[in-house]
């Protein structure tokens, strides 16, 4: 079993002389949920169907396109799994900012982008956001909350959350 022991950050500015290295790095992928990307020890399935293990330094949080490497040089790229999320889209940026404030005040790990925010689906939070006057779209999408929101939080307390 391959043991991935360290993280090699993905660079978006690959040049032609790095093409072979980049190709080798992306041959294998590991698709993980946000919760799985916060674990430093985890049994995973590689894109070729084989099992591997993550043995990363404690506190490592993986992001999409990060590359992990084994001691013998095998690399795999992390991809974000689609998850059931609630996404709030709005052109009213003040209202959207208020929703982000209220969600953050409840320590909800939150992905914040231009014109929208996203959190793991929770009907209680959806109701709160709708009471603010915003629409919530429940969808399957990749989820990458702002850094720091999930260190030791109570992210495992979602009633009715199934895998």
Curated annotation (Swiss-Prot):
GO terms for molecular function: nickel cation binding; unfolded protein binding. One of its GO terms (biological process) is protein-containing complex assembly. Keywords: Chaperone, Cytoplasm, Nickel, Nickel insertion. Its main location: cytoplasm. Pfam families: UreE_C (PF05194), UreE_N (PF02814). Residues 144-163 are annotated as: Disordered. It is found in: Cytoplasm. One of its GO terms (cellular component) is cytoplasm. It comes from the Bacteria. InterPro entries: UreE, UreE_C_dom, UreE_N, UreE_N_sf. Belongs to the UreE family. Involved in urease metallocenter assembly. Binds nickel. Probably functions as a nickel donor during metallocenter assembly. This is Urease accessory protein UreE. It comes from Aliivibrio fischeri (strain ATCC 700601 / ES114).
